[in-house]
Amino acid sequence: MPDIKAIQADARERMGKAIEALENNLSVLRTGRANPGILKKVMVEYYGSSMPIDQVASITTPDARTLVITPWDRGALNPIEKAIRDSDLGLNPNNKGDTIFISLPMLTEERRKDLVKNAKNYAEEARVAIRSIRKHALDEVKKVEGVGDDEIKRAEAEVQKITDEYIKRVEDTFHKKEQEILG
């Protein structure tokens, strides 16, 4: 049977993973500045298997509005171009023979609002995950045997304090991304 400290440490670790998942989800949202992270979820069909674009090419940002994709094998050029074109990112790759250039257009106000809405949804998913972890931790604390009611109450208060800390991190992460998107 785990002790109270172990339950709290486990909750903290799992809440940290929820924050990491939020940051990963937010990193693929386009902000108007070139960021190789927006291509993170693009999968390239190459030699009969599907793999992330960063495993078949290097992605650089020569300026704030351009991405340059240089495949490690020229045979991957067309599959990379097709994967980017078929993605839901709304990007138009320009194949230059040995590299692919992507000029990022200015975001329209409507597109910015959509991106903020997506970011808000990701933040809500993280909040729900953190609350679920809190509920699990509180249930585990109540099951600990040989501990007085006062100790249980203190442990529950500590779990709530940890939860509040991670919910605040979700809010801060969301607001930072919102500011990036809205420019």
Swiss-Prot record:
InterPro entries: Ribosome_recyc_fac, Ribosome_recyc_fac_dom, RRF_sf. It comes from the Bacteria. Pfam families: RRF (PF01765). GO terms for biological process: translational termination. It is found in: Cytoplasm. Keywords: Cytoplasm, Protein biosynthesis. CDD domains: RRF. GO terms for molecular function: ribosomal large subunit binding. GO terms for cellular component: cytoplasm. Responsible for the release of ribosomes from messenger RNA at the termination of protein biosynthesis. May increase the efficiency of translation by recycling ribosomes from one round of translation to another. Belongs to the RRF family. This is Ribosome-recycling factor.
